[in-house]
C-alpha cells in the first residue's frame, strides 16, 4: 500500500531552518522512503532538493560542481554509534573489525592472551583504540631508537642525599599488577632490547631482573597483556620474526573517512585527504592527513576559518610533499592554497 505524506503550511512552519538541515544527508527523504516503504510527497523531495542546493551554495559552489553526493558531510552520529571515554577525556568511536567491535576485540584478545600488533600511519587511531579498550589500567612505553632495557624494566636513580633507589619500569609494573602494556612505536626499538619481553609473553610468564638482584624474578599476574603499535613505513622500523610470531593478532589500521564526516570534518577536507591517501598508496607522496589531523582541521576551521585551516594543514605536511598537497587542496577548494607563514 502506498501512503502519501502531505506537508501543509502548518508543518512547514514547524520545520527546522535551513542551517539545521544543511548538516543532514542530502538523500534523507529517499533513505526514509526505502526504510519504511512509503512514497513521500513530492513537496518533501522539493524541500530536500532545496536544502541540498543550499548546502552547495554554502560552500561557494554551484550544485553541479558540489561535493559528490556519495560523500555527504554530516555532524550527526547515528544513535547506535558506540563510543568509549579515553583517559584524556576524549571519546573513541568504535569501528568494525570484521563482524566485531574493535574495542571488544582488544578486550577479548586480552582475556584469551592473544597478543595484538596494530600497524598504520601516525594519527589513524592506534593509540586511541588501545586507550579506549583498557582505560586507566593501561601502561605505556613510547619506543624510539634510543630505547634501552631500563626504559622497560626500570633502573636506579640518585636521590638528593646521594642514595640510589630502584624504580620499576612499565613492563615490570604491568606484569606484577596484571595490567595491559602498550609498546608504542615498537618497530623503532632494537630487537635485543625487545627480547626481554619474550619470557613474559610465552608460557613462562616471568622475567628475571638482572640489573637488580633484590627484585629477583617477576612473574606476570593474570590480566597482564602486551599490545604493540607501529608505523611500518617509518624510517628504521624493524621487527624480528621471533617478535612477530608472538603477536598472533595483527591488523592494519586506516583512517575511517565515513567516521571523519560523521564527526563533523568538512567533506572537502575529507575528500582531499582520501585523494592524498590514494597517492600515498601509489607511492606518489609520503604523507596523507589521518584522523588526528582531520579532527584538528575541523576544530581550527571553526575558530580561524577555512583558508587558515588549510594553510595550517599544508604547513604540517612534509616539505617534499607540499606541492602535491597544495595542488590537491587548491583543486578541492577552488582557490590557491599555500602553507602558513608569519
Predicted regions and their residues:
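C-terminal regulatory/interaction module of P-loop NTP-utilizing enzymes
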Residues: 1-342
Amino acid at each position: 500500500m502506498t501512503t502519501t505524506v502531505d506537508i501543509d503550511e502548518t508543518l512547514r512552519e514547524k520545520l527546522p531552518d535551513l542551517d539545521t538541515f544543511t548538516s543532514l544527508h542530502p538523500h534523507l527523504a529517499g533513505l526514509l522512503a526505502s526504510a519504511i516503504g512509503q512514497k513521500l510527497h513530492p513537496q518533501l523531495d522539493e524541500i530536500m532538493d532545496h536544502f541540498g542546493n543550499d548546502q552547495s551554495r554554502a560552500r561557494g559552489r554551484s550544485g553541479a560542481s558540489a561535493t559528490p553526493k556519495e560523500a555527504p558531510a554530516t555532524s550527526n552520529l547515528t544513535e547506535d554509534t558506540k563510543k568509549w571515554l579515553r583517559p584524556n577525556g576524549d571519546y573513541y568511536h568504535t569501528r568494525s573489525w570484521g563482524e566485531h567491535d574493535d574495542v571488544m576485540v582488544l578486550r577479548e584478545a586480552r582475556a584469551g592472551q592473544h597478543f595484538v600488533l596494530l600497524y598504520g600511519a601516525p594519527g589513524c587511531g592506534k593509540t586511541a583504540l588501545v586507550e579506549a579498550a583498557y582505560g586507566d589500567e593501561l601502561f605505556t612505553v613510547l619506543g624510539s631508537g634510543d630505547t634501552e632495557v631500563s626504559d622497560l624494566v626500570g633502573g636506579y636513580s640518585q636521590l638528593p642525599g646521594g642514595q640510589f633507589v630502584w624504580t620499576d619500569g612499565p613492563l615490570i609494573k604491568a606484569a606484577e599488577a596484571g595490567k595491559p602494556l602498550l609498546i608504542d612505536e615498537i618497530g623503532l626499538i632494537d630487537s635485543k632490547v625487545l627480547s626481554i619481553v619474550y619470557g613474559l609473553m610465552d608460557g613462562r610468564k616471568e622475567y628475571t631482573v638482572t640489573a637488580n638482584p633484590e627484585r629477583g624474578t617477576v612473574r606476570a599476574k593474570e590480566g597482564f597483556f602486551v599490545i604493540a603499535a607501529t608505523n611500518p613505513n617509518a624510517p628504521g622500523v624493524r621487527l624480528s620474526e621471533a617478535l612477530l610470531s608472538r603477536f598472533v593478532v595483527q591488523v592494519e589500521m586506516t583512517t575511517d573517512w565515513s567516521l571523519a564526516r560523521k564527526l563533523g570534518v568538512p567533506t572537502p577536507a575529507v575528500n582531499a585527504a582520501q585523494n592524498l591517501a590514494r597517492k600515498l598508496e601509489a607511492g606518489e607522496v609520503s604523507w596523507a592527513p589521518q584522523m588526528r589531523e582531520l579532527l584538528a582541521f575541523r576544530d581550527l576551521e571553526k575558530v580561524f576559518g577555512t583558508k587558515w585551516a588549510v594553510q595550517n594543514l599544508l604547513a604540517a605536511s612534509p616539505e617534499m610533499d607540499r606541492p602535491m598537497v597544495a595542488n590537491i587542496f587548491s583543486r578541492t577548494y577552488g582557490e590557491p592554497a599555500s602553507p602558513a607563514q608569519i
